[in-house]
Amino acid sequence: MEEGGRDKTPVQSQQPSATTPSGADEKSSGKERRDAGEKDKEQELSEEDKQLQDELEMLVERLGEKDTSLYRPALEELRRQIRSSTTSMTSVPKPLKFLRPHYGKLKEIYENMAPGENKCFAADIISVLAMTMSGERECLKYRLVGSQEELASWGHEYVRHLAGEVAKEWQELDDAEKAQREPLLTLVKEIVPYNMAHNAEHEACDLLMEIEQVDMLEKDIDENAYAKVCLYLTSCVNYVPEPENSALLRCALGVFRKFSRFPEALRLALMLNDMELVEDIFTSCKDVVVQKQMAFMLGRHGVFLELSEDVEEYEDLTEIMSNVQLNSNFLALARELDIMEPKVPDDIYKTHLENNRFGGSGSQVDSARMNLASSFVNGFVNAAFGQDKLLTDDGNKWLYKNKDHGMLSAAASLGMILLWDVDGGLTQIDKYLYSSEDYIKSGALLACGIVNSGVRNECDPALALLSDYVLHNSNTMRLGSIFGLGLAYAGSNREDVLTLLLPVMGDSKSSMEVAGVTALACGMIAVGSCNGDVTSTILQTIMEKSETELKDTYARWLPLGLGLNHLGKGEAIEAILAALEVVSEPFRSFANTLVDVCAYAGSGNVLKVQQLLHICSEHFDSKEKEEDKDKKEKKDKDKKEAPADMGAHQGVAVLGIALIAMGEEIGAEMALRTFGHLLRYGEPTLRRAVPLALALISVSNPRLNILDTLSKFSHDADPEVSYNSIFAMGMVGSGTNNARLAAMLRQLAQYHAKDPNNLFMVRLAQGLTHLGKGTLTLCPYHSDRQLMSQVAVAGLLTVLVSFLDVRNIILGKSHYVLYGLVAAMQPRMLVTFDEELRPLPVSVRVGQAVDVVGQAGKPKTITGFQTHTTPVLLAHGERAELATEEFLPVTPILEGFVILRKNPNYDL
């Protein structure tokens, strides 16, 4: 085809110049050609067509005559001709084509007719004809004055055309002109059921969205169409502004409830973040099996409902929602996959593959920094497996290979290994609580918090163990216990925990770091709840701090706590932004931007992204400042306080673009392109933040283009860009065991063998890549990427915002912040149970998810599938469906824990 096209073009361009030297000739030749064309056209008409054309012309003439008795039969005949013309999909039906030249004449005839049935008939015919004319909505105009007979008789194309005109007309009428909207509504009430019955559900939805009457859908939907309609509505949510998006979700939710599809309705209620509605859906369902399935969904999303004890199977439901069985189910999967054998960091580094000239990297093996890296790697790789080779056998030996804060993080990594195992885990950590070293004790406290992350326990062991240390004399002890509480109760909005923590911020003994961590912990506990006490306490703390204190790098956690408290709440932050106006620069811009981006997290709000791009394009005169900064840093390397940086909020803006756009794919693609520009042309502050933004937009989804970009910048001249790029590579591939990434990181480890900081980052990235031996994910989205877990986003943000000052926080003494990732860790598995919650292995097909929105029929939802037996792992962008007819899933999205029922129609 292409070649043909290529051959044609030169011929066309030569034609006029070869045949017609002057412009005048060209015109005349054009005219001749047209005349010839018309003659051909007449010859082209076959006998039948000629007969039809004459017949139609005769009918039109008959309507122009004086004899009114002939009108009726003439109109009847015209109507019959138009209707009976079987139309092909690509061309205009013949009668309409031949009647087109008579359109004006027919309108005149209509105007001159006496009112009555004939006039209405004529209006109907003109309305259908108007489809072929690009007129001023005449199709609709004549329909409204026509005979009002049913639409279906004129065919689908006519209905579609009419719907388009109704939508345009509606938008031009104001609310004042209600009377004129009535006839349009009547028409809509005819169009919608017609579309529903003829597989054009999405057209019905579009029309109702245009005229803002989505609620009308509910009564026209039948059992066969509801799934498609709701899929279409929920897919549109990303592309409509507030408050229409919630209206669409509520409409789809109403439809699901009408057909008693409780799990689907619950998912939408969670998208709306409306807890009363969630509770209402949960309690109004009377089927215990479905309730258990919903409890699994709530547990995965980190929502716990206080049920009344007289609910049937109260204990089971509470246990499922509390994620009590998460650990045992995860270990069952590990046994199934045969990966229980603990791994040591060297299995991950694969040092034997490095072709070092000096035979292994022997010289610097036992440095404290490398041991710290190994503690993290060991924790990440064996996360939730409950056993390892460094800490669970004889931990003291390993702990004392670390120094000071290194001991804190090393002890805390034990919590990660025992993740979710509250009963068994705490007994193993207990012995370290009696250590003589404050750092080890503090790490053990943090470990207690980590073990409880995402799991609720009646006895509240985390609160009981950690509460005594929150106001301890030693700030080190405070850090472990406060951050531990933040992780253990993230997303619970528990008042008793918050009342315990809030006073610490204002306590005179609290260092800036402790105040920051407290704000962070409170933000995580109250995530997305707009808790008034948290807001006022953090604001008060910010107001009370002096300008010098706010320049401390840990001050960044105060506004982050505020932002997390309002995560995804949109406009609810106006008052806070106003309150922050009194704070001095540069902290004010930093805090404002941070709170603002948190409020719109995952919303895909394009206008916000535009504002953030404006912030990124501001230019500060930073030449002198950069020089000062270098001198100052040489002078006081040990001093934590980095000089005030006017562009600090730009880094947050870059992260914010990723945070807002990560919710939907088109936005994420566009953000990706923007990041490319920023990396090439941005200021240093921007460039340091871009790798982190790339990590956030593609967590646990190792796309090659992103990995290549990060790999390029992992050799950047600015050390902070390279630190962040290397860590981002780990985030992008977290829990995937991606072989290509693992090879890249091994090469980097060789390249940076002499640079302890970069090597530390490479080790962290290697640990993350093999997170949970490849069974866990950090991606905050689940349920087919529809639901965003706020707790997971809070954990990721905590880490990424800290990485904006990687040198003083992560490579300084506060690497324990990396345990914020625990809040985002989730197994990426699919486990199936029978109605009694016994594991039920069935065969499932796992393949790449295909978007089937608005497609006719029942298209395949996955492609390139393989058949496995559950439990199975699901990678990013994969979807599973049952490969057997024997069972029916209680929820349509097979992810996490799914209950199956016997199919009553299955014949053995």
From Swiss-Prot:
Biased composition (Basic and acidic residues): 24-51, 623-643
Required for interaction with UBLCP1, as annotated region: 708-903
Residues the record lists as N6-acetyllysine modifications: 551
GO cellular component: proteasome accessory complex; proteasome complex; proteasome regulatory particle
Gene Ontology terms describing biological process: regulation of protein catabolic process
Gene source species: Mus musculus
Family: Belongs to the proteasome subunit S2 family.
Name under which the protein is recorded: 26S proteasome non-ATPase regulatory subunit 2
Gene giving rise to this polypeptide: Psmd2
Keyword annotations from UniProtKB, A to Z: Acetylation, Phosphoprotein, Proteasome, Repeat
Residue list for modification N-acetylmethionine: 1
In-chain residues carrying the UniProt-annotated modification Phosphotyrosine: 194
Comp. bias regions, Polar residues: 10-22
Entry-annotated residues carrying Phosphothreonine: 9, 20
One Pfam match: RPN1_RPN2_N
